[in-house]
């Protein structure tokens, strides 16, 4: 459960990300594909080269989902309900991959905003990303 301080910290980080969300989404995916190559199996039709149009497009979707979750931080489940259905019923993505994606997003934020990622903010952002992952896998059962 995200505390009031967690919510403030997460919103603060996303305000710093601002117009870079799409870029960070693509960078997160690229990092995940390199660090966790097994995740590539869900994207057999993608050009997985650095800067590919497909990675940029999917990175934009990832970023949009995270921004949507931040904008509805008190109802992440409601905000991401359709996306949860898609991942559980159609895409059937292994739930561990959301943890991988979250970790890679944390790394991207740390690279671009090192001073913003204090231990407290890091913990809040990690809790938020875990909450998003939990929502996206809730309908698997």
UniProtKB/Swiss-Prot annotation:
Does Heme count among this protein's keywords? yes
According to UniProt, the tissues expressing it are described as:
Red blood cells.
Pfam families noted in UniProt: Globin (PF00042)
According to the entry, every stretch annotated as the Globin domain falls at: 1-141
Q: Where are the transmembrane segments?
A: none
Question: Where is O2 annotated to bind?
Answer: 58
Q: Name one GO cellular component term.
A: blood microparticle
Give the molecular function GO annotations.
Answer: haptoglobin binding; heme binding; iron ion binding; organic acid binding; oxygen binding; oxygen carrier activity; peroxidase activity
Entry's PROSITE patterns? GLOBIN (PS01033)
- Please tell me where heme b binds in this chain: 87
GO BP field: hydrogen peroxide catabolic process
Task: Alphabetically list the UniProt keywords.
Answer: Heme, Iron, Metal-binding, Oxygen transport, Transport
Q: What does this protein do?
A: Involved in oxygen transport from the lung to the various peripheral tissues.
Q: Which family does it belong to?
A: Belongs to the globin family.
Q: What's the subunit arrangement here?
A: Heterotetramer of two alpha chains and two beta chains.
This chain belongs to the protein called: Hemoglobin subunit alpha-A
State which gene encodes it: HBAA
């Amino acid at each position: 459960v995200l505390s009031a301080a967690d919510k403030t910290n997460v919103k603060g980080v996303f305000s710093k990300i601002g117009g870079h969300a799409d870029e960070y989404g693509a960078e997160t995916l690229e990092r995940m594909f390199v660090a966790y190559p097994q995740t590539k199996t869900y994207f057999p039709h993608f050009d997985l080269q650095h800067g590919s149009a497909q990675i940029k497009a999917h990175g934009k979707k990832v970023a949009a989902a995270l921004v949507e979750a931040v904008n509805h931080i008190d109802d992440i489940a409601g905000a991401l309900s359709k996306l949860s259905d898609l991942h559980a019923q159609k895409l059937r993505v292994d739930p561990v991959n959301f943890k991988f994606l979250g970790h890679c997003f944390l790394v991207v934020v740390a690279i671009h905003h090192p001073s913003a990622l204090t231990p407290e903010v890091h913990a809040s952002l990690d809790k938020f990303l875990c909450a998003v992952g939990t929502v996206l896998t809730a309908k698997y059962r």
